[in-house]
Curated annotation (Swiss-Prot):
Keywords: Disulfide bond, Mitochondrion, Transit peptide. This is Cytochrome c oxidase-assembly factor COX23, mitochondrial. It comes from Debaryomyces hansenii (strain ATCC 36239 / CBS 767 / BCRC 21394 / JCM 1990 / NBRC 0083 / IGC 2968) (Yeast). It is found in: Mitochondrion intermembrane space. Transmembrane segments: none annotated. Belongs to the COX23 family. One of its GO terms (biological process) is mitochondrial cytochrome c oxidase assembly. Its main location: mitochondrion. Residues 1-10 have a biased composition (Polar residues). A motif (Cx9C motif 1) lies at residues 73-83. Required for the assembly of cytochrome c oxidase.
Length: 126
């Protein structure tokens, strides 16, 4: 392998690392060791794996058909459903999952309202 091709490959790797910022990727981090629940300080604690303030949710929300349902907190929703299926006798065990899903949805709709107040379009006709 020539030196020039090695340099090109290294540059591509560096570019990919830079492009993996939260705004450019929709990847859900599933490895618990890599999730930063306290990103930005104590006031920004995050108790769910989804990223409801990602800019891509706005476009998916506006591009969905009127009769379709879009959930930006899909992973939290699925976790709460799985907990209910595991603990059918006692739903109080799943309260943390319910709260995380509710918080995720609240963050998503707060982002939506904030974008509208700032005059940012893209949320559909409403």
């Amino acid at each position: 392998m020539s030196d020039e091709s090695q340099i090109n490959q290294e540059n591509q790797k560096e570019t990919r690392k830079k492009d993996d910022s939260p705004l450019t990727t929709d990847e859900v981090i599933k490895d618990k060791g890599k999730v930063d629940f306290t990103k930005g300080g104590v006031e920004n604690y995050k108790f769910y794996p989804d990223n409801p303030v990602n800019h891509r949710h706005k476009y998916r929300w506006s591009m969905k058909e009127p009769s379709k349902y879009y959930d930006p907190c899909e992973e939290s929703r699925q976790a709460s459903i799985n907990c209910m299926l595991r603990n059918q006798e006692d739903k109080t065990v799943c309260q943390d999952f319910f709260d995380a899903y509710k918080e995720c949805k609240k963050d998503f709709f707060n982002k939506k309202v904030a974008d509208r107040r700032q005059g940012k379009g893209g949320w559909g006709i409403w």
